[in-house]
Amino acid sequence: MTNFKDNDGDGTKLHVVMFPWLAFGHMVPYLELSKLIAQKGHKVSFISTPRNIDRLLPRLPENLSSVINFVKLSLPVGDNKLPEDGEATTDVPFELIPYLKIAYDGLKVPVTEFLESSKPDWVLQDFAGFWLPPISRRLGIKTGFFSAFNGATLGILKPPGFEEYRTSPADFMKPPKWVPFETSVAFKLFECRFIFKGFMAETTEGNVPDIHRVGGVIDGCDVIFVRSCYEYEAEWLGLTQELHRKPVIPVGVLPPKPDEKFEDTDTWLSVKKWLDSRKSKSIVYVAFGSEAKPSQTELNEIALGLELSGLPFFWVLKTRRGPWDTEPVELPEGFEERTADRGMVWRGWVEQLRTLSHDSIGLVLTHPGWGTIIEAIRFAKPMAMLVFVYDQGLNARVIEEKKIGYMIPRDETEGFFTKESVANSLRLVMVEEEGKVYRENVKEMKGVFGDMDRQDRYVDSFLEYLVTNR
């Protein structure tokens, strides 16, 4: 391996190791931050698995290929129950993700060997590698937890001294007692049931609950870096710093930029032609990402709600999470024929940033993952939201408090929703006078998320901290 310090002539250039969790919602922001570090002349080593790196490489500009060193480490082979080529959360069923974490823990030895040989200045790591901070400390390497979660999620997590607090799903249905300001940020019961199993309690032999993973990383790191900014959630960032008694530094939201290598393919030209034919801000853009998959019942209500709303739509439909998914979902019979005059269902890949940035898009019907929220705000698109997994419920409550997006009403116990609630929510946010506040507020927040000079200053402050505290 290259020892980048050998090439550091004046001692001001850093070698930073990036070690994200095996989910694209984590690997992509880690790569985006890696690009920004490299653009300032620092060296970056990006550790992940071979297949994940191969899927990330198309996102890398050619001018950065010499300063970002991709370190391919294979997951250990064994009886880990993962499918062939299962190297990211999108590659495996939800019930097998614990085995992906066990395999990730199996990278401990090769990661240690790389750190010993390369002698970096910093390791920026994700929540899952609870075993890494003691190793970095032994080697004299500074460790930062770079959180792909926002400050509100970190502020809701259990800090030191509250080990016996919140031990059942129902305990998560109200803001925790350490939050000193008024907020509605908490889980609904149906959300608690999903996250509690893997986060607080673990039933898979050999796996470690997420609360212990993230707790070990936060306790062991020197500093917490957050993909966020003070203009969005100063109170949550301040609370996180107070709770954990160590620096909490926002790096900015890392706003996405359209792919510079993107070419006008026949696919995009077909999509663009359809969007160009529609009025400004008239289209509901529907997409639920690579992780979330609505159930058949949920998909039916979404489709029938779109139909009932009477609004034009462009739906990027994913019917299964991967080739291993043997239960694809299907649209209600006759739906596409009945809505053909005002809607398009797209079953292939689409360049999301270009689609989102199109003037015809007036609303996004989506999940409230943090990366998705950033993209929508970046292009001033208000959101109608459905929670499916992970921290999405917390993200959605923050967005609702700021009246940038609207949660489609659901039964709080079972999580079911109706076509009427979908239709009413879409019309509220997109066209009704009562929903004007959402449309105006997202424009205002775009002035923060889309202000590249402001976001660059966050990155500069982050890098200054790394250099000063190497």
Curated annotation (Swiss-Prot):
<dbReference type="Pfam" id="PF00201">
    <property type="entry name" value="UDPGT"/>
</dbReference>
<comment type="similarity">
    <text>Belongs to the UDP-glycosyltransferase family.</text>
</comment>
<dbReference type="GO" id="GO:0035251">
    <property type="term" value="F:UDP-glucosyltransferase activity"/>
</dbReference>
<keyword id="KW-0808">Transferase</keyword>
<dbReference type="InterPro" id="IPR050481">
    <property type="entry name" value="UDP-glycosyltransf_plant"/>
</dbReference>
<protein>
    <recommendedName>
        <fullName>UDP-glycosyltransferase 91A1</fullName>
        <ecNumber>2.4.1.-</ecNumber>
    </recommendedName>
</protein>
<feature type="binding site">
    <location>
        <begin position="389"/>
        <end position="392"/>
    </location>
    <ligand>
        <name>UDP-alpha-D-glucose</name>
    </ligand>
</feature>
<feature type="binding site">
    <location>
        <position position="290"/>
    </location>
    <ligand>
        <name>UDP-alpha-D-glucose</name>
    </ligand>
</feature>
<keyword id="KW-0328">Glycosyltransferase</keyword>
<dbReference type="InterPro" id="IPR002213">
    <property type="entry name" value="UDP_glucos_trans"/>
</dbReference>
<feature type="binding site">
    <location>
        <begin position="350"/>
        <end position="352"/>
    </location>
    <ligand>
        <name>UDP-alpha-D-glucose</name>
    </ligand>
</feature>
<feature type="binding site">
    <location>
        <begin position="367"/>
        <end position="375"/>
    </location>
    <ligand>
        <name>UDP-alpha-D-glucose</name>
    </ligand>
</feature>
